């Protein structure tokens, strides 16, 4: 049994009546994978689709298209092609944008032809380079496991069946099977860190051991296991909720974590919600302090923790606005509706007040007071503190006024004055 067939059995990949989408470039790796799939699948003409995106980044990129047309025609498999329009090329960050456009193209092809699997030709040398790149750039172990052999892209499973093959093995496979391919000439330049690692560092490491690809796979599998153990631990903790412009959780829910585990927990939450890698240092849960890291702020207030992405904080408009009952309105990036009726949407709160067609809404100014049931006034900041809402989030709590009096403050206050003629207003939030 070859490494190729072993990949499918070890990962329980079903073959019968399944459709495969191969991302091909015309290079030696994807050409080898194409040939392996044609030899492996029971009915490649019906089961296999080859997708090729011409990035139009080189004058000779059309040669790859010509090669794939000849090859797929000879092998009797379908080829789907598209060009990345030059006018969409960015001035900077071309590689990231190209990848984004490529995977959007592949996802679209997958949906159109209802393919079950997407296969890419990443191999063991790519894995080694990825590990070294992440080690140099961040040292984050989780990032070193970015090239997983089985993943997901939309409704398709993403498969990388060549990760246990070295580049040399694939070149030998191409030679043995008399396969033509095109080498991207930019791969031979030293202008990128990946290329410099490929040309100068990886060959030295291979001289030290003949098991470098095997060891890289073992490292990747170990990291995947450790990452799963960590995510299982963090997912077993009570999940924070979306609160105003933050994630909010109870400090007691994570009290058993030590300072390093707490830092990793908040790194995990940020990546899970915002897909951004952030690395907090030690986090002491017993101190009511604020931690700032890049565009994120972590703060502890009263019995809660709050995780805020400052990029999502809208500019506060100090002006109140008039809204009509039963009509949706926007406040600080969220949609609300005030009505006397019951709705299926999430109820943000309710209050009692005089019957009216219009209400004033806005952000409660600092220094405001709120009327108690006794008729006395209390400082609004006291009510915010009682409800564990920190200063940074208070302007984002929706306030409703009637006759210049606040009658509702989201998550904080509702009119306490009793009047038999008052009616109930429900405040709904739309996500």
Swiss-Prot record:
Belongs to the tRNA(Ile)-lysidine synthase family. It comes from Lactobacillus johnsonii (strain CNCM I-12250 / La1 / NCC 533). SUPFAM superfamilies: Adenine nucleotide alpha hydrolases-like. Ligates lysine onto the cytidine present at position 34 of the AUA codon-specific tRNA(Ile) that contains the anticodon CAU, in an ATP-dependent manner. Cytidine is converted to lysidine, thus changing the amino acid specificity of the tRNA from methionine to isoleucine. One of its GO terms (molecular function) is ATP binding. Keywords: ATP-binding, Cytoplasm, Ligase, Nucleotide-binding, tRNA processing. It is found in: Cytoplasm. GO terms for biological process: tRNA modification. InterPro entries: Rossmann-like_a/b/a_fold (IPR014729), TilS/TtcA_N (IPR011063), tRNA_Ile_lys_synt (IPR012094), tRNA_Ile_lys_synt_N (IPR012795). The N-terminal region contains the highly conserved SGGXDS motif, predicted to be a P-loop motif involved in ATP binding. GO terms for cellular component: cytoplasm. It catalyses: cytidine(34) in tRNA(Ile2) + L-lysine + ATP = lysidine(34) in tRNA(Ile2) + AMP + diphosphate + H(+). The gene is tilS. ATP binds at residues 25-30. Its EC number is 6.3.4.19. This is tRNA(Ile)-lysidine synthase.
């Amino acid at each position: 049994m070859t490494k190729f067939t072993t990949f499918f059995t070890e990962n329980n990949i079903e073959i019968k009546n399944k459709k495969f989408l191969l991302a091909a470039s015309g290079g030696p790796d994807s050409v080898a994978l194409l040939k392996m799939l044609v030899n492996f699948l029971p009915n490649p003409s019906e089961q296999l689709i080859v997708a090729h995106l011409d990035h139009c980044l080189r004058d000779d990129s059309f040669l790859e298209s010509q090669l794939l047309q000849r090859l797929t025609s000879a092998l009797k498999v379908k080829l789907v092609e598209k060009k990345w329009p030059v006018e969409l090329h960015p001035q900077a960050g071309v590689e990231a944008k190209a990848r984004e456009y490529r995977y959007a193209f592949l996802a679209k092809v997958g949906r159109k032809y209802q393919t079950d699997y997407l296969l890419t030709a990443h191999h063991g040398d790519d894995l080694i380079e990825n590990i070294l790149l992440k080690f140099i750039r961040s040292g984050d172990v989780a990032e070193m496991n970015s090239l997983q052999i089985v993943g997901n892209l939309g409704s398709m499973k993403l498969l990388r069946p060549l990760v246990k093959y070295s580049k040399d093995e694939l070149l030998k496979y191409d030679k043995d099977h008399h396969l033509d391919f095109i080498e991207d000439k930019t791969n031979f330049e030293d202008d990128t860190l990946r290329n410099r690692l490929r040309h100068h560092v990886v060959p030295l490491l291979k001289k030290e051991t003949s098991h470098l690809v095997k060891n890289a796979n073992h490292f990747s599998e170990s990291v995947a296991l450790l990452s799963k153990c960590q995510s299982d631990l963090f997912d077993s903790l009570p999940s924070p909720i979306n609160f105003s412009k933050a994630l909010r959780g109870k400090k007691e829910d994570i009290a058993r974590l030590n300072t390093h585990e707490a830092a990793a927990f908040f790194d995990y939450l940020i990546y899970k919600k915002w897909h951004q890698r952030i690395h907090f240092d030690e986090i002491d849960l017993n101190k009511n302090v604020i931690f700032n890291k890049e565009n994120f702020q972590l703060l502890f207030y009263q019995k809660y923790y709050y995780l805020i992405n400052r990029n999502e904080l809208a500019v506060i408009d100090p002006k109140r606005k008039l809204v009509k009952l039963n009509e949706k309105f926007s406040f600080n990036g969220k949609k609300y509706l005030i009505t006397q009726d019951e709705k299926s949407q999430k109820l943000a709160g309710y209050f009692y007040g005089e019957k009216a067609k219009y209400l004033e809404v806005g952000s409660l100014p600092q220094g405001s007071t709120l009327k108690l049931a006794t008729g006395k006034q209390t400082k609004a900041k006291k009510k915010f503190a009682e409800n564990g809402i920190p200063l940074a989030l208070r302007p984002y709590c929706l306030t409703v006024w009637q006759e210049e009096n606040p009658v509702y403050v989201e998550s904080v206050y509702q009119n306490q004055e009793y009047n038999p003629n008052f009616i109930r207003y429900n405040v709904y939030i739309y996500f």
